[in-house]
Amino acid sequence: MVGLVFDQKRYKTELARKYTTFLSKYPEIFSDLVSGSHFDFAIYKSIEEYDVHIQLDIFNVYRNGQGIEIKPGRATNGDLELALSVDAVEKLIQTKNKVDYAQLLGSFYNEPDEKNGWIDFMLHKRTQTLIDMGYGRFAQTAGILEDDDDIYSI
């Protein structure tokens, strides 16, 4: 798989540049997703800013036939938004493979903490559609879901 980052100078923060560079080095993180999957990564300073939708930075990832494309800004008609705290991103970019990344991501969802890191999801498509696109498999690897039926509780 190939990971491509576009327009890195358009990111508002150095953290987003580091995160997109990290994701481009490990495109296998997205190997469970079908080609055409398109979603946003939004970085937030705090839970309060997340609650009122004030992102520190935002970019989108598109899964194509060869790998991923990462671009600044929101996806057009994205599948979901993955909201992440600054602390979570700083820790995630230290991981070395898909499984470690997924498990740490899952811990931020299952045990959110304002100081140590948190993530949340905003789904923009039907849950069954997201399962069919491979998001369920990734969530299982992350420990967010025990099986596909658990996605309905997100």
Whereabouts are the PLM-identified features?
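Feature captures hydrophobic
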Residues: 1-154
